[in-house]
């Protein structure tokens, strides 16, 4: 990792101290810093490195147009975000491990920036050879697990036993969490899935109610109601998390709530578009002026 072990971000929520090595976050909100001192970059950024994926999940909302981001351009964007106060970057896709320089990008972010490095993967390419290149270069790994056992195999078309084997390799490299798409097919697996997460040592269980796509209408109201009740009664040891778009409905607590919108989060698509989230189709193209110029342009779009 970079010699920088901690970072201080100033924004509308206060002064935010963050250590990417330990994961410690401390928000000093007793005094509101003047607006002129606020950092300009979003607190967190996600980047779809490529649209390529070798799974065909019916509910996937990622674009299917072939696109892969250039390594050198990506490095420039990461440096910009770092210099302007972002705390972390999450690589996704598609399947990020299919980017030809995936390991190099993780190394650049770890060695040349002070950003916390995470990525989301289906996990099946995270074999020991690749994982050995990621040691000390990623801070957290998210594995997508929609359903468990036979449900997982039906929806993802891959062996659940193979997924478990990859998971056990992953946990030797970095702390990990499980991403769980909630819909009519998976909601009955919630209890078994959270038990599995606990038994395997997951640090977080991210609930992702299915988003609507041109092919599917998203999670139904009946399933939403069941999910809300499940969250309300949850008493397990694995930390629950939820996407920002569903946070209010599921009663999530956000200590940085004053830092919302583009101050909290932004997404870059594999087509080099800066967006407010990965679920949105609108955004602005990132041109030669850089990603911060694109951010200023996006802020003007209501």
Language model features: what each stretch is:
Residues 7-8, 67, 142, 195:
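Alpha-helical interaction segments
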Residues 122, 201-202, 213-214, 298-301:
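Short, intrinsically disordered/low-complexity patches at protein termini
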Residues 1-64, 82, 253, 257-279, ...:
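N-terminal pre-core extensions flanking Radical SAM catalytic domains
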Residues 17, 87-88, 117, 141, ...:
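N-terminal hydrophobic or amphipathic segments with adjacent small-residue motifs
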Residues 9-10, 19, 23-121, 125-132, ...:
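Conserved alpha-helical substructure of the radical SAM core
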Residues 137-140, 144, 150-275, 279-292:
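Radical SAM enzyme [4Fe-4S]-AdoMet core and its adjacent flexible, acidic
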Residues 60, 68, 116, 163, ...:
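Secondary-structure transition/capping residues
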